[in-house]
């Protein structure tokens, strides 16, 4: 076996027992060499079933001939090929939109215990590092492309990431491989192409090992980010106490353990926490965290992000997104209380036990409501909610059950959610706040 084959087999060792290997096959040099290497290796090694995926973006006329080229090579190698046509959304960055469309297709086609293999190499890693450096990225961004990560229900692996492009070219020439040269790759109005064709030749003439050095720096940053993530998990463990209002279904953290940290550790912990919800705020936007953290104790500060918000209430910070940012629709008649009632944009409501008689209606708080409480008589709802400590942001979404225009119960709040004699209980299952940042 060639050194390149040995290096590839070693990189793929953790996935030798996967259900399938899919090669992201553009038809270019990188993916052509990767597919050819794998097709040769499977002749002498027991490997998972191998297939190829070609994504047709439909962005240029030349691309219409590429599926046929890919099919011919796959036929020669005996590898099944799937061609997927995607629609690229118009936007400011055509490169990013095409990448997003491509990876959406890959996510849909990669099942559990399956691996998508891509052909990025060391020169690509160096370009990514420099591109992000010029955009002012932090340690996480400068870590560039990881060797592996999750992809939908499966995994993505870049087994050639430590291999220089020159080695791939030499392999292709040795085996008389032909590949597609994308005409758009010479357009220097694309940022990556500008770096590849204008900047890197200058750098490598002065520093021949520039690409290798940048890739090594990216590896150092990845290791540093791993330590930062480990520290963040430790700090978040201190703040991850259970709230009495966990039934709201919202992600939340106890504020005091976070604010006891240094400002840098606060941001590190919150970056790690918010990363699971989507894109992180940029450097200038972190002033919103300072304002939320330092607001008066009796204030209700909000940090507004792209598609979500952080609220501070009850000594905690709460992540809200999606339906939680929209006013639910009310009132609603509940004609059959034996069945759960779907609340538009607000989950569902159900009555446990023997339903009360009369005309049932569900409303939301408007202000000035009064209800009768066992052994306490008539009480203002506002005072009752204050006694319960329910966060203000949740009060306008809390379902109120009326019978013949009388406020009878408040969902989920002990002592207010059931009949005086215990014949029934009002239970609310809120909508999930699962929409992340954009």
List PLM regions with ranges.
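Core alpha/beta nucleotide-donor-binding catalytic domains of modification enzymes
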Residues: 1-201, 206, 230
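AMP-forming adenylation/ATP pyrophosphatase catalytic core
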Residues: 4-29, 51, 57, 86-88, ...
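A broad structural signal for alpha-helix termini and local helix breaks/kinks
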Residues: 110, 207, 274-278
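Residue-level detector of well-ordered alpha-helical segments, enriched
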Residues: 125, 213, 265-269
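Amphipathic alpha-helical interaction segments
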Residues: 194, 198, 216, 268-269
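Short amphipathic alpha-helical segments with coiled-coil-like heptad repeat character
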Residues: 206-209, 393-395
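Substrate-binding/catalytic subdomain of NAD(P)-dependent oxidoreductase enzymes
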Residues: 211-219
